[in-house]
Every structure is written in structure tokens, then in C-alpha cells.
Amino acid sequence: RIGLEQFVPVVARIVHFTGYELKLDQIELEQPKDSVVGHLLGTADLVAQLADRCYLEKCRDRLYPEFVLGGIAIDERADGTVLYRSAEDLLGKTLSFYQTSARMRLENNFNRVYRYFEAFFERGRSPYIRFIRKNLTFLNTVIQNGDWNRLRRHPPCVVPDPRGEEHLMELALQRVRDWSSKQPAPPRSLAEASGL
């Protein structure tokens, strides 16, 4: 015990600023300062991920398999909605995600608190914002050229299982195969497609 247990309830709510499981306006906090802490935490989490020099490879090699296993890439509803057909499809939608979701959070929902970080950097320019732009520009080039092989970085994977990343991909591929086997076969002819 370190004597901070009274903060547990509020911290348990503040941590939701880093996720998407709740709408931000559903996070109930009594003190305005707690909302500011939530904005700072949410901003730090989002900016650190987007600025990571291996962000694109992590989306491809880790986030997509996690989305598959979590039922996000292939929706678990009866209609089997497919949001991301592949890791490349996820990356192809990342620019839109940044514009419509991440940037909206940073600029509006989190009240641009990333500006406070700028005071710590030379000439007030945040390397995080610079690296986010660099990642998104590079991704746009990869998409335009269709050259996914340019994503060559292999970020370290710190998990107890030395084959953890490989195992994650195997599980995700099995989930996709299971889903595919349940889908109706495409019609073999135009007559079959029209029900004749």
C-alpha cells in the first residue's frame, strides 16, 4: 500500500480517454482538472502511437491481427460486416482514420492540449507532430505506389512467448479462414446469381 487508493475510482474513469470503448462525453468526472488530466493522457497515448517510427508496421503486423481476434475487422454481427479485409486495407483506411477520428480527438475533444508539449521542445516545435506527418506522408506514398514492401521495419515485440507475434498472426489467419468457410459460395453463373 502506498496510500493512493482514494484515486482508484477516478483513475479508472480517466484511463478511458485512451480508448474508444466509451464516447468521451460518457466519461463522468466530477472535477474539471480530472478532465484535463484525461485530455493530457489521451493526447499522450494517441500522439505517441501515431509518431512511433514503426507505427505503420505495428498497424499491419499487430493491430490488424488484434482486430481480427477481437471481432473488429470482421464484425461478429449476423451480416458478417467486414471492416478491414486485410492489413493493407487497414493501412489504406488509416489516413481517413487520422483525419476523421484521431485529429478530431486531438484538436476538438482534447482541446489541443498537445500544444502544451511544444514548450518543452526547441523553437516550440514538437517532434511528435513532425513524425506523425512524416508517417502519414510515407503511408500515402506507399498507398499511391501500391508498394507495401516499403514497410520493412521489425519493431521489437516484448512478450513472454518468443513466438508471440507469429502466434498472434496464426490465430488471426485461422479466425479469417473460419469466417470465410461460413460465407455462402459465390454464384457460378449469371443465371444462378439472378435466381433462375
Provide a role label for each language-model segment:
Residues 2-6, 16-196:
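Divalent metal-dependent phosphate-bond-processing catalytic cores, especially two-metal-ion Mg2+/Mn2+ enzymes
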